Amino acid sequence: NIFVEEAMRGIRDTGGRGARYYTTDICDGIAQGHDGINYSLAHRDMIANMIEIHGNSTGFDGGVFIASCDKSVPACLMGLARLDLPSIVITGGVMDAGPDLLTLEQIGMYSAMRQRGEITEEKFTYYKQNACPSCGACSFMGTASTMQVMAEALGLMLPGSALMPATCKDLKDMAYQAGKQIMELAKMGLKASDIVTMKSFENAIMVHAAISGSTNS
């Protein structure tokens, strides 16, 4: 909501008026290991559908799309492509790492070590409680972080805004600047299809290779 308010303020300060629409997002990490993962792509498509429905049922001149995680970022990209309006994506940033660069990615390894008796239950509990120390997308180059980079590489985010730490104060200013910039894009009539071209896809593919991005992307 902080970023929504900042984006709205940027729109207001540039002479526009925005409207807020929300949709829910599931966590692929929590959904793994049981039937919940079968909802992953379905919920991505539902988010994209709702973006299309809200966008086309109302006379918007542009859109700021806020998402951070595995399927919500691609859902926004799919939705804004269908709308083909002036569009900017901003993200909620990336989670801080835990002690000794501990991340959620390592919990599976520690779980196996606990089952083999190589670490104590106490140590395993410590890892679980400290792997996700803040809000934000998972702090490793998984699908969420990769998709943030891909959105910027495609030209749909402000330069330098992908992978900013979720606890970084600059993120608020980035959201505000996105609100101001969407007004400029709307005045120019610069649509998503004017930015996302074959060349921008080729650029994103090269960037993906350069960062060793998630193959899920």
Q: What is each PLM-predicted segment?
A:
Residues 2-42:
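Anionic-ligand anchoring segments at beta-strand to alpha-helix junctions in alpha/beta enzyme folds, i.e.
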Residues 212:
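Active-site-proximal helix/loop microenvironment
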Residues 205-207:
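Flexible, glycine-rich loop/tail regions that form catalytic "lids" or insertion modules at the edges
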